[in-house]
Amino acid sequence: MKLNQISRIVMAAALLGSVTAVTAQEATKESDREYYGRPSFWRPKDKTGINVFETTKEHDTIPFQGLRLRLGAGFTQQYQNLDHRTKSSVPLYKMGPGFNLAMANLITDVQLADGIRLDLTTYLSTRHHNEAWVKGGYIQFDKLPFNTPFFNKLMEYATIKIGHMEINYGDQHFRRSDAGQGIYNPFGENLIADAFSTEIGGEIYLQKKGVFGMVGVTNGTINSSIGKQARDGSGDSTKYPAVYFKAGIDKNVGKARVRFTGSAYINNKSQRNVLYAGDRAGSWYWGALEPAAAQGFTTGRFTPNFSRNVQAVMLNGFVKYGGLEFFGTYETAKGNAGNAGDATKGIIADLDKRTMNQTAVEGLYRLGARENVYVAARYNTVNSELPGYTEKVNINRTSLAAGWFLTNNVLLKGEYVIQKYNDFKPTDIRYGGKFNGYVIEAVVGF
């Protein structure tokens, strides 16, 4: 066996050893007790938060006896061995096997009052921002302090969220890796077109017996929005908020759990909409199909460059029967972007809307009474129009993954991935592009 092959195995074993340092006795002490200091109506940050979507209105088991503060965290350390190639003449970044920068989140949960909680997440270290950076925060109301029969009855079914927060568009964002918080994601990376954004606004939910609806309104951009809006090609400089809707059903049918949801997001004009470019952490495929002369943070992902006039719809289906799980995503979106030259004159000239479609299908099987081991497969494809192209481009990805929960808080997972790029222009580094290989990731969440 060659020396470099031995060194790779040793380094991968070191990652495994750093996780398996937990004793066998500790690994079997899976406690179902309540978390000390946890808030009400929340999503746990460990394994028990998997397949939790919107919080429910079920009666809480911890009575409010005063302010409660809980500090949590998410931590990921990844080893990757990827190979990439292109038919373009653009030189590729020369990469080999090695460890990626660890990512970490600090999560602050505060129960402020009965039925009122605060969620604040800080990125301590990510691929894009290796310094501390606030992701966002919100206040969630599941009860109101008015103590009147009308509001008490209303809040049996209603939830209100207000803040600079991750918007609830689609179900896929509940299963994605978010910097150090990778315990919900059975795979090594998010979807190719990663719909995720933090915006300033509010959401109102109504739910009863597994049927729910939601409406949200935000400023339509990831940053503050006090700047004057640029005029478009028609001379209109009006600034619009983003409005989004979601409805679905989540019920147990016999021994199976079945969930179907539909979401729509509309943002006619904002300064800088980032529905498909709002992740400030970065992708998990470091250096993949990246040019030698540049260092990005979204390698392996695709954005259609919609910054204005965005209209998007996502449909999701989830079925769980015993250890078998199915999760599907269909998404279609259209929008346009500003022309850089005209933008300097205060005019946005690009009024030609482009369309993008995305499909993802994944299946998992979780083994054992506690479902501590799983195997998974996912196929993800994107077809999109781009400026200057007469035909749509295509990107497709096949992922095979497996994972092992040593405890509810510690996960070791690995993924083998093949991603191909089709119909890009010869001048584009993605022309005839492909990357493949494996990633191994240790995750801690609490």
Identify the meaning behind each predicted range:
Residues D60-D83, K94-N223, S237-K255, R259, ...:
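Outer membrane beta-barrel
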Residues G49, A73-F75, N105, G282, ...:
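Glycine-centered small-residue hotspots that permit tight backbone geometry or close packing
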Residues E26-Y35, F41-D46, Y93, Y138-F141, ...:
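Outer-membrane beta-barrel pore domains
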Residues I192, S234-G235, I429-R430:
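Alpha-helix capping and helix-loop boundary segments enriched in small/acidic/polar residues
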Residues R175-F187, N223-D232, R280-L289:
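Short, flexible helix-coil linker/hinge segments at the edges of structured domains or between repeats
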Residues K2-T76, P149:
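N-terminal periplasmic/intermembrane-space "pro-region" immediately following the signal or transit peptide
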Residues Q78-K87, Y123-R127, F146-T148, I167-Y169, ...:
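Sequence/structural signature of outer-membrane beta-barrel proteins
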